[in-house]
């Protein structure tokens, strides 16, 4: 059925069933398949990737490039009505270009995420990001590329929790009271480890240790 596009402050797109999507940075043009990369730009990007791979190879580092699909590529059914000019879009083309013209490892887990959404909500309704379950599925694709033992998402326990206000609510200057039913998950895939506290940059564990994510060039 026809659902007209409605954009708030040039940045937030209202979708079906109250879903929100990011409208900035040419996201809508990408969704419609319009902003295809030229051969010259693809060649330039690949050249930079090869340069980085060469540096990593000399240091004995295994390099993996991973592209995370935009939310609208996974939850297209909640998007407003748009005419799709090309279903073979820029990321699909670029991933194929890299694979056909180099030995660089590149991961684009769009099929894995589309399969996972049959069982869980894997992106936030009111935020641009994937949730913990989406990230878990994506990481398994990375593990596969690195030959690290994988965990089938269907075999893990996941506790559903409420998600607080998403970034799209703030970007669109929307009333948060109308967008308060989002979903996240606490994924329990290593029962021997219990999370005692999660304070942003440090997660306490019951064995006395802690998990600290690295950000940018910060050493850990």
Segments from the language model and where they lie:
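Extracellular glycan-modifying ectodomains
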Residues: 1-220
């Amino acid at each position: 059925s026809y659902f007209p596009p409605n954009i708030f402050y040039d940045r937030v797109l209202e979708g079906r069933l109250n879903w929100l999507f990011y409208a900035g940075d040419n996201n809508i043009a990408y969704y419609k398949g319009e902003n295809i990369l030229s051969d010259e730009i693809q060649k330039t990007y690949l050249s930079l990737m090869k340069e980085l791979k060469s540096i990593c190879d000399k240091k004995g580092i295994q390099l993996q490039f991973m592209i995370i699909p935009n939310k609208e590529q996974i939850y297209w059914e909640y998007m407003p009505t748009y005419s799709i000019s090309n279903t073979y879009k820029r990321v699909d083309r670029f991933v194929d270009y890299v694979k056909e013209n180099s030995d660089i490892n590149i991961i684009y887990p769009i099929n894995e995420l589309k399969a996972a959404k049959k069982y869980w909500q894997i992106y936030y309704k009111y935020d641009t990001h994937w949730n913990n379950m989406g990230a878990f599925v994506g990481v398994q694709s990375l593990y596969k590329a690195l030959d690290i033992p994988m965990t089938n998402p269907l075999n893990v326990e996941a506790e559903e929790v409420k998600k607080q206000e998403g970034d799209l609510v703030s970007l669109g200057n929307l009333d948060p009271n109308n967008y308060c039913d989002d979903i996240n998950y606490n994924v329990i895939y290593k029962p021997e480890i219990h999370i005692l506290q999660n304070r942003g940059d440090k997660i306490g564990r019951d064995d006395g240790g802690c998990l600290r994510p690295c950000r940018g060039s910060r050493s850990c």
